[in-house]
Amino acid sequence: MQGKAIASAGVLALAIALLPAAARPAEGPAAGAGTYEMEVLGLQTDPQSGTPLLLLRAKQDKRELTMFIGPVEANAIAIPLQGMRPPRPLTHDLLLEVIHRFRGKLKRVVITDMREGTYYANLILDAQGQEMVLDSRPSDAIALALREGAPILAAEAAFVRSPEPPAEGGKQ
């Protein structure tokens, strides 16, 4: 067990060391530039497939996005939605703690696109005064934003198509 903890700590340290190389300077949709601030309406289950659904609505014009997500991702989003605080940090809590310890902040998340039934998102971080963009699954980005109180935005491209229920083992 101790070996796993040391290995996990090593992977985390390596990820932090490589963060500046992996992140890229901010580009793409900025807040207000063809984006819409979203509110999380909640989670539901698709009656046909039994797959969890994440429901979001644009604050400006009330357009909605529905995302099929996995049960683990739904749980990660449900925890902050219900105001729960687990006794020990979960993965998203840990990631935010690491960001904060390195004097960073999650500024916003942007759902950037939907292609071939898969939504795409970016985390926009303030890394010691430099704005950085990290690619993210939308469910992870939203779970982080809800914990941080960061805005959730969606680019116009995310509204273009409607998603289909994922096939067994499908993608978000």
Language model features with spans:
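Bacterial N-terminal signal peptides that target proteins for export
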Residues: 1-11
